[in-house]
Amino acid sequence: MTDVTVKSLAAEIQTPVDRLVQQFADAGIKKSDVDSVTQQEKEILLAHLNREHGSVPNKLTLQRKTRSTLNIPSTGGKSKSVQIEVRKKRTYVNTPEAEQAKAEEQAQREAEEQAQREAEATAQKIAEEKAKREAEEQAKREAAEKAKRQAAEKEKVTNQQTDEKTKPAQTDKARREAEAAELKRSVEEETRRKVEEDAKRVAEEARKMAAENEGKWPEPVAEQTESADYHVTTSQHARAAEDENDAKVEGDRRSRTRGGKATKQKKGNKLSESKADREEARAVGRKGKRKPSTLQQSFNKPVVAVNRDVVIGETVTVAELANKMAVKGSQVIKAMMKLGAMATINQVIDQETAQLVAEEMGHKVILRRENELEEALMSDRDIGVEAAAEHRAPVVTIMGHVDHGKTSLLDYIRSTKVASGEAGGITQHIGAYHVETENGMITFLDTPGHAAFTSMRARGAQATDIVVLVVAADDGVMPQTIEAIQHAKAANVPVVVAVNKIDKPEADPDRVKTELSQYGIQPEEWGGESQFINVSAKAGIGIDELLNAILLQAEVLELKAVRTGMANGVVIESFLDKGRGPVATVLVQQGTLNKGDIVLCGFEYGRVRAMRDELGRDITSAGPSIPVEILGLSSVPAAGDEVTVVRDEKKAREVALYRQGKFREVKLARQQKSKLENMFANMTEGEVSELNIVIKSDVQGSCEAICDSLEKLSTDEVKVRIVGSGVGGITETDATLAAASGAIILGFNVRADASARRVVETEGLDLRYYSVIYSLIDEVKQAMSGMLAPEYKQQIIGLAEVRDVFKSPKFGAIAGCMVTEGVIKRNNPIRVLRDNVVIYEGELESLRRFKDDVSEVRNGMECGIGVKNYNDVRTGDVIEVFEIIEIKRTIA
């Protein structure tokens, strides 16, 4: 081959000249762009590049497409033509295994040639040495014989001696050549035998290595024949003829399509039949005994398990998890059963369960965060980082036991009459107010003290800075007082104790201090950290001292907040107003909330259409520690949800819908989670009576508290099921739901509209209104008590001792008895006792006194008793008469 320059070679292989020169230098060949390159240097460069980058197996792919027509007979003697297009593909791969086998064969052949050459050289060398040694020995023998002979007649005998000397030499030479040839043959046979043994050993090692590699993922060596195109092995003329036939078939199809009618094929028309048609006809002629196609694919089942990276979201179904791990759904269900969880293939499971199952099956789990949109929305907020934090008013929550004077104390501070407006004189939802004092502003949260409002008190403690614990001086520490202390400690909030009702004669502040010290509230005069202020909400005693104590505690806490930027806060209370829509009471914690802001509140979103303070006045903005009512949300938010102002309303809507969907999925995943240990409990659920209830309330917090209280009333025999609950008036939808589920409707501070009342009258539903939570809970208890199974008690009413036994033809054995205790009545159940052991339990059939039938016999009188179906009465037995009394059960 003619040598080329480096520059022309770079142009030929389409690579920069500098890069090619550098590659030659890396391979150990110094070249410039004008130097010539030999074929040997090209091979050296190619070997170097293969070592550096790895060799890619040569691959040749041939594709072919065949179109044909298939006639399918149908009903009515007609036939339907179906156009078939067959695409074939054949790939030739120069696999590394073939190259390795070729290299091994070449190495074996070279080894045999080398061994043969070495054997020939060794044999020739041995033969030459042996011939030389024999020639020397022969020369010595001849010299000895020559010395012994007489030198007589030298001239005459010279020719004769020469002839005699030449003849043995020729004979010896022939013998030496024969021995050398024999030695050469033996050496060649020995060498060939060794070479064959080496070749067998190499072949055996190669076979073992192939057997080991066969157990792993096999390379598609059979790809040449498996995915082969038929036309590759045919001749050029056969391919041309078949292409011409396919072209004619395609032309006929197009002409029929243009003509608008499909002409019927002639039976013997070979031109209109393609290769696929002919194969189909032969298959039908053999009655379905079709020859297996050479295009059949083979699959070798993998032996080694494949570990995958499984990406799991917050919720996933069993079928989706199985697809991610590339296993059957039954295997995932089996793995979950081994872990103690029952599941179906379409069941939604939570992220933790899916992670356990995937790791149990040997896969690597990647947990995916699906709230990226929410994080992006929250990060794109102007929160006034550059602005300096300013002092803000403290948020004070008033907590304590019911009727200890919390609202009355706040009422005196605000100089309003709120307590008189509360139903029953007790607070039923959180009231948020801010008060301007001489020393600064204070925001008060008034929480209910009833036991049903536990979650509302906890919510108030989490949103507050200081807790004012109101304890009545005449009542001391009560259960809700203890609960308030626990909420304050859980929220890590300082406590200021207000000992109320100090003006009463029976007031004992020292007892309150002693009782509170048992729960970790130590007064300052005892060395503790809590301030104790004696107050009277009625007389106004100690109110200024209480406010000063609150402000002093706030100064110690150094409460600060940023007033500029987008606001965030917490929902204190929410309800549905018929004229204004969803209304939420929001306590602003950071920033400034303005009218027109876009807010994201839990599962709800919206634009603030209007803002009002606690007095009902319209305002346009609210800073930190200010409670406001906002209008414009999509629905009623849950109390305790975080309120955040965002920029984009569209993204806020997407985040709210995403939260709703996730909440629903997680809730379903938790509900459907069925453990093996709960199976027996689930089997007996059908025996429990259920009281279905539909609850409507005026505010979200009260509705939540009522639902929690009623669900806690459930027992093993009667279960309270809240069919529906909500905020707002009772509508026709609520009445229809109650009628369909057989539920009673409870309205708390709400009323039913005209359409709902019409459904209630038509269906005969039980509709009740309440304004105090005590009455609601008590009446539900009574309804549950009526659903309890009755309890029966056996009460002994009389004892009679058998003195004698008589025989009666009508009743059999008659016991003559003396009534020793109580009254004996006819037709009552009795027991026969012998030696204080019950031997029979039955019914009293006959009761007589002096041969007269009587209904009862009193203490100290004699009578005759006939026991029904029992004749084994003996003297000395005791007959015990009792009656069964039904006991009315109640819910504790």
From Swiss-Prot:
A GO term, aspect molecular function: guanosine tetraphosphate binding
Listed Basic residues bias regions: 255-269
Biased composition (Polar residues): 68-82, 224-237
Compositionally biased residues, Basic and acidic residues: 99-217, 239-254, 270-283
Record region (G5): 536-538
Residue span of region G1: 400-407
Ligand binding (GTP): 400-407, 446-450, 500-503
Residue intervals of the tr-type G domain: 391-560
Localisation: Cytoplasm
Primary location recorded for the protein, binned into one broad class: cytoplasm
UniProt xrefs under Gene3D superfamilies: P-loop containing nucleotide triphosphate hydrolases, Putative DNA-binding domain, N-terminal subdomain of bacterial translation initiation factor IF2, Translation factors, Translation initiation factor IF- 2, domain 3
Stretches the record annotates as G3: 446-449
Region described as G2: spans on this chain: 425-429
Pfam families in the record: EF-G_D2, GTP_EFTU, GTP_EFTU_D2, IF-2, IF2_assoc, IF2_N
Residue segments, region Disordered: 65-296
Similarity annotation: Belongs to the TRAFAC class translation factor GTPase superfamily. Classic translation factor GTPase family. IF-2 subfamily.
Protein name from the UniProt record: Translation initiation factor IF-2
Organism: Yersinia pestis
Gene field: infB
